[in-house]
Amino acid sequence: MTLTGRATASADGRDSTEPRIAAGEVHVWVADPDALDRDGTLGGYRATLSQPERDRAAAFRSEADRLAFEAAHGLARAALTWCAPAVTADAWRFTTTPHGRPEIVGQPPLRPLRFNISHTAGLVACVVTLGAACGVDAERVHRRADPLRLARRVCSPAEYARLVPLDDPDARADLFFRYWTLKEAYVKARGYGMTLPMNECDFEIAASLPAGTPTTVEGRSVARFGPRLRDDPARWRFAQWRPGPRHLLALAVRREPGLPCAVVVHPAPPPLP
């Protein structure tokens, strides 16, 4: 996976109706829902939501959960319009697969836009590609929680064996969430949700993870899949980073033969035209 750093906010000189995304590119946006609300961006995003999305948002009892839902879905619409400026943010229409993965309605079959969103307390994320299956997972690391009970179910035996000897609860929680976000991003990219056995994904990752910059996790040496997944880890590229001190973000993208896999992390949420 090639990391191209952060996208520039300057105009690229192309016709505003031309797609800004090319095959082999992976565009990622992250944002704080509260910050979007404070600066007024969320109000614009909220106006682009469909009536079913507004109804779902209104059903949340928690104000924080409602803001995160609106921010994630508004961010997705703005990001898709950034990639394809000929379509306004409120014009995108979506359907869901039998396992709940959102897909765009009415696209050409050859290299359609693919996207995925994630939201957690204090962070929303969106990834967009041209044709490549993709998944993103954002999590706030709960350092006080002991993850071993859940780890028995979702971690591979090798991953679980690495967690158990860690005496520091913060270190154990951090490593567990690193495994969890990579697995979540992968199963979301596959489009089968929790029906895929997470413990069949085995990641061998470095103990430290720097903040801010995506770190690649790729190849058979660090990702191994069990037979029930019916998949080849060599076909996938993973990245993981800390967008802030309390959050982890993981990305999974299916590699297309003959194409690069260039991750572009945008410095700010996309504005609405």
Each model region followed by its residue ranges:
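Core catalytic alpha/beta fold that binds nucleotide/phospho-ligands
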Residues: M1-P273
